[in-house]
């Protein structure tokens, strides 16, 4: 999913912080910022990837439209406009899609800049044309996907989300693959640098002692 993204390898970080299991949490001073890490235990991901220029589209049908019909129309729309979906989730009849801004701009047309004018009225009208009529639409622009790839572990998901919560990094979407080898989160694009630093320090550096 993130094959075009820059990757940070775990073996590129040296360990000089000692045993992480001695405390429930650890604070790291990095570039005049304090990063709080929950104790990871035996967690050692292989890499972190990030993909920017993501738009999150949240859709829900009107009451008169059955869920199965609404879902079919959404997928037909994606196929018609050949929109690549980076992440997808459903909940109580709602559909949330993470789409590349460039793909949206191509589908809507060159008259609207998906990167710089994402919340404009022109873009909203363009999205309304792409999608079925029987829906309520919300857009969340300027997002990014951060993906952690590693070994299967029942603890890695909890540690990732505890670390993000401790550092005030909010998530909009979460995806965990069936093999438990990777976790992807959609966050605000303005928090990508912070998230990379947090994950590198808390997941890589402290796991090298195990």
Curated annotation (Swiss-Prot):
UniProt keyword annotation of Transferase present: no
Pathway(s) per entry: Alkaloid biosynthesis
Stretch list, region Disordered: 1-26
GO biological process: alkaloid metabolic process; homoserine biosynthetic process; lysine biosynthetic process via diaminopimelate
GO cellular component: cytosol
UniProt GO MF annotations: aspartate kinase activity
Application of this enzyme or protein: Loline alkaloids show broad-spectrum anti-insect activity, and different lolines may have different biological activities. In vitro tests of NFL, NAL, NML, and semisynthetic loline derivatives with long carbon-chain acylations on the 1-amine have shown that many are effective against both fall armyworm larvae and European corn borer larvae, but the effects seem to differ depending on the modifications. N-Formylloline reduces the weight gain of fall armyworms by deterring feeding, and does not significantly affect corn borers.
InterPro entries attached to this UniProt entry: ACT-like_dom_sf (IPR045865)
Biased amino acid composition, Polar residues: 11-26
CDD domains the record matches: ACT_AK-like_2 (cd04892)
Organism superkingdom: Eukaryota
Keywords: Alkaloid metabolism
Keyword Protein transport included in the entry's annotation: no
Induction of synthesis: Expression is induced in loline alkaloid-producing cultures as well as in planta.
Functional note: Aspartokinase-like protein; part of the gene cluster that mediates the biosynthesis of loline alkaloids, potent insecticidal agents composed of a pyrrolizidine ring system and an uncommon ether bridge linking carbons 2 and 7. Lolines are structurally differentiated by the various modifications of the L-amino group and include norloline, loline, N-methylloline, N-acetylloline, N-acetylnorloline, and N-formylloline.
PANTHER family tied to this protein: ASPARTATE KINASE, ASPARTOKINASE
Family: Belongs to the aspartokinase family.
Protein name, UniProt field: Aspartate kinase-like protein lolA2
Organism whose genome encodes this protein: Epichloe uncinata
Species lineage: Eukaryota, Fungi, Dikarya, Ascomycota, Pezizomycotina
Gene designation per UniProt: lolA2
């Amino acid at each position: 999913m993130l094959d075009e993204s820059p990757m940070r390898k775990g073996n590129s970080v040296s360990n000089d912080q000692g045993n992480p299991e001695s405390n429930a949490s650890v604070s790291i001073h990095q570039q005049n910022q304090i990063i709080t890490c929950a104790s990871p235990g035996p967690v050692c991901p292989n890499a972190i990837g990030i993909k920017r220029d993501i738009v999150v589209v949240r859709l829900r049908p009107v009451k008169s439209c059955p869920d199965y019909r609404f879902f079919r129309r959404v997928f037909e729309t994606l196929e018609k406009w050949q929109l690549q979906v980076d992440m997808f989730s459903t909940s109580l009849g709602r559909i949330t899609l993470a789409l590349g801004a460039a793909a949206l701009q191509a589908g809507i047309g060159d008259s609207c800049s998906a990167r710089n004018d994402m919340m404009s009225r022109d873009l909203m009208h363009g999205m309304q044309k792409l999608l079925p009529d029987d829906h309520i639409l919300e857009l969340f622009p300027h997002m990014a996907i951060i993906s952690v790839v590693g070994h299967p572990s029942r603890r890695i998901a909890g540690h990732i989300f505890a670390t993000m919560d401790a550092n005030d990094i909010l998530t909009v979407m979460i995806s965990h693959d069936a093999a438990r080898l990777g976790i992807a989160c959609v966050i605000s694009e303005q928090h990508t640098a912070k998230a990379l630093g947090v994950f590198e320090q808390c997941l890589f550096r402290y796991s090298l002692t195990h």
